């Protein structure tokens, strides 16, 4: 038979456990989005922002700034969408070097990065996979600056070269805060660098969802990829994997250790 003192202790412990369990069950699913700011990514971002925040809470966004868009216009576009949706509380980080000044001057290598196999543990340099997008399309997509300028309400947040939070800092901060799911809808560079550098934080990653690759392709013409260059040169490559295949390899390999 338990003594009154021990009984009180047991009841107290059970009460604390029940309180913590209720807190966990009632907590929203925390989400971090890693994007290359392609046009379809805007729709994905808007969808996440429309979800009930008490159930699904987007807490951070990181940009994988490659040849598809550049860091300055991409970050500003994201900022304006967040402002329009009333979510200026969301931190935005960018992987890549360079910048755009307030007067529109484009600094060298804006938003580019070396594929992970060439860059070591940094995110600086030029992208060697520009063959995946013809030059004309790059310039057309960079004109998303004009889209945001004419169609989106603009808040006060702006991309500032050398002061913008890095993608790695945002990922580390958000994963360190507690359990989180990571959505990757661009190249895998940012996530691969994080997973390789911060194995001690893997226990906080609940799920990783990626948009990339092709499985059991049944195209009768043999074209299973989606590159913008001539399909016959690489009929199987998928854009998000192709832009940094070694990073994708690292993500898939390290997933087994989560």
Curated annotation (Swiss-Prot):
Residues 1-22 form the signal peptide. It is an enzyme of class 3 (hydrolase). The keyword Signal applies. Keywords: Apoplast, Glycoprotein, Hydrolase, Secreted, Signal. Glycans are attached at residue 52. Transmembrane segments: none annotated. GO terms for molecular function: hydrolase activity, hydrolyzing N-glycosyl compounds. PANTHER family: INOSINE-URIDINE PREFERRING NUCLEOSIDE HYDROLASE FAMILY PROTEIN (PTHR46692), NUCLEOSIDE HYDROLASE 3-RELATED (PTHR46692:SF1). May be involved in the degradation of extracellular nucleosides. This is Nucleoside hydrolase 5. It comes from Arabidopsis thaliana (Mouse-ear cress). The gene is NSH5.
